[in-house]
Amino acid sequence: MAKKKKLSFTNGIAYIHATKNNTIITLADEQGSVLSWASSGSIGYKGTKKKTPYSAGIAAEAAAKAVIDMGLKSVEVHVNGTGASRDTAIRSLQAAGLEVTKIKDVTPIPHNGCRPPKKPR
């Protein structure tokens, strides 16, 4: 996970990558250097339990506690993906003690790009 060191800044960026099978939370400083990360799988959940919003919340709390110890106080959240656990992860970051200053959805949307496989058509 993260090294225990005091930071000279208090703002950061939280990246939440929510897929249909897992949720990955990465906390970085403003330059993009990763400070801490956690996922539903790294917390210890396997199989279908990784997709639950509860496991995403636990992962977000674990990642947030590591950076709060370093001195991070507020984050800007970038959410990517259409998974069910996006909102829970944001609420868990707030509940862990991080102030959320901005929420930005960075999910890529095709403007009639590649043809999808058989199922989504």
Swiss-Prot record:
GO biological process, alphabetically ordered:
translation
Disulphide bonds annotated for this chain are: none
**Keyword terms of this UniProt record:** Ribonucleoprotein, Ribosomal protein, RNA-binding, rRNA-binding
Question: Gene Ontology cellular component?
Answer: ribonucleoprotein complex; ribosome
Query: Which stretches are transmembrane?
Result: none
GO molecular-function term, one example from the UniProt record = rRNA binding
Q: Which InterPro entries match?
A: Ribosomal_uS11, Ribosomal_uS11_bac-type, Ribosomal_uS11_CS, Ribosomal_uS11_sf
Summarize the protein's role. Located on the platform of the 30S subunit, it bridges several disparate RNA helices of the 16S rRNA. Forms part of the Shine-Dalgarno cleft in the 70S ribosome.
Under the subunit heading, UniProt states: Part of the 30S ribosomal subunit. Interacts with proteins S7 and S18. Binds to IF-3.
Similarity remark: Belongs to the universal ribosomal protein uS11 family.
Name of this protein: Small ribosomal subunit protein uS11
Species this protein is from: Ureaplasma parvum serovar 3 (strain ATCC 700970)
